[in-house]
Amino acid sequence: MDRIYSINGPVVKVNDAKDFSMMEMVQVGEKGLIGEVIGIDAEYTTIQVYENTAGLKIGEPVKGSKMPVCATLGPGIISGIYDGIQRPLTAMTELNGAFVAMGSALPALDEERVFDVTVTVRDGDTVKAGDVYATCRETPLILHKCMIPPDIGSAKVALAAESGKYKVNDVILKIIPDGESDAVPLTLAHKWAIKTPRPVRRRKTIKTPLITGQRIIDTVFPIAKGGAAAVPGGFGTGKTMTQHQIAKWCDADIIVYIGCGERGNEMTQVLEEFSELIDPKSGRPLTDRTVLIANTSNMPVAAREASIYTGITIAEYYRDMGYHIAIMADSTSRWAEALREISGRLEEMPAEEGFPAYLPSRLAEFYERAGYVETVSGGEGSVTVIGAVSPQGSDFSEPVTQNTKRFVRCFWALDKALAYARHYPAINWMNSYSDYADDLEDYYAENAGEDFIEVRRRISALLIEENNLMEIVKLIGADVLPDDQKLIIEIGKVIRVGFLQQNAFHKDDTFVPLKKQLLMMKAILKLYDESAAALSKNALVSDILKLGWFEKLSKMKYDVPNDKLEMFAEYEEAITRSFYEILISGETA
């Protein structure tokens, strides 16, 4: 029996251990704390413990499992809330109360829950990795598809159960893999190592945006299904609120929300709000398509790393069924801090700001598991990763933000000044970018309008021009500007307040369809073009402002319901009439 030699926080060492292998899951101490082997040398085996090690003593036993840290994948995951190593927190609360007891070893899935299973294969059928052998209704929104595990090649069905009611551990199928004689039993669930990406047939070209209903995201800085985005911002800039809003309204089939080292109250807020909110497409609560991984700031530091990998493994599992998954990781900085703490305890040579030298490779391992793929069974699915980054003091030059930028193509930089000015989402349009816009042009042309890309380009150009002029205004004031530049300042304000700013508590403004976003931009450009034409005919900016259209378009997000888009045509006609009248009155004068 191998025994503990030293304890340093979550890092435990065992001496003279010959039986352990790298990345093996172990049980540490008399209480069987879950740990993982992270280092082996001639003298010691180093173990990272995913639970609180308070009370652990030298000499206590360490048992190997001969398998890596795994997630249990099967029906019953959706609507669940788990800790970083996929222990069900609801069941643990009933067993141990409000706090997680050391060494709690509850199964990830409810083994007593009965599912109405439809078996889709018969005796003698030939099956291969990824083939669906049974289906069951997991929630009213999600049809769960039980698949042949990816590590099994071609096989023949030796025995298939009849359709009926089964629990997750009941044997549904017995298969004989090619080249073997022994039958392998398959239940509704199987295990998969969390640090091993699930295989795919091939990655596909990204062509479809993740529609969030947030104008600055969908129009200005879009993210594609299968893409990766970073949401960096200092304290109070709205990282969590932005992720909550995307999780509520995006058109992904399933949301995996990972609370990694953040406040417990935020996870409570997700639980409360998602159970009350109704999915507009199905009429069901949002919890029917949500998985929560809660590893809050007062939980063991080492488990933050496991929570990230557990979440993305669950996402890949549902992706293989053909679903589109969105992952919200809040926050990857807390995970990086956990890496730094454990690296320090291991006495590794620190790199920039004390983070370990392997920080970039760990971030890459996570973000590269996003993608739009053809699954091993020939279907399509995607995993979209949106990771919050919490740089101290809003310093975007720190290592986590800079290394994250290397692996994402969408960067939503949150601005403290915008947040404190109550401008939400507080995404700074000058510091943010999206490399997906060009890939999504065909989708926007087909589903929003042929002129969407050109309209978007003009809106972005006006924002850049306004930003440049604001530098001058800060120095010498707006009064000295010529009228054409005053017009850009005014139209920029309409774009910022009337289009980019969004009210999450307003029934029509919390989610805005793509076609309304286009019509709003076209109305703003109509006002700008008519104003510029009037200025060229010697009208004054002051007279144009008196028409009231700048204020009216700033409020159109509230005044035009999402189901009455024909009102925009009336707006444009009224704008044309107003400017015709101002020009006529000017000529008469």
Task: State the predicted function of each range.
Residues 17, 31, 67-68, 86, ...:
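Short, surface-exposed secondary-structure boundary micro-motifs
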Residues 49, 54, 116-126, 156-165:
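Short histidine-centered loop motifs in beta-beta connectors
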Residues 1-101:
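N-terminal accessory targeting/assembly segments
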Residues 219-220, 226-541, 545-549:
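P-loop NTPase catalytic core
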Residues 23, 49, 64-68, 145, ...:
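Short beta-alpha junctions and helix-cap segments that line functional grooves
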Residues 39-45, 75-86, 142-163, 183-198:
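Short, compositionally biased
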Residues 535-589:
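C-terminal amphipathic alpha-helical interaction region
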Residues 94-150, 167-227, 242-245, 280-299, ...:
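P-loop NTPase nucleotide-binding/switch module
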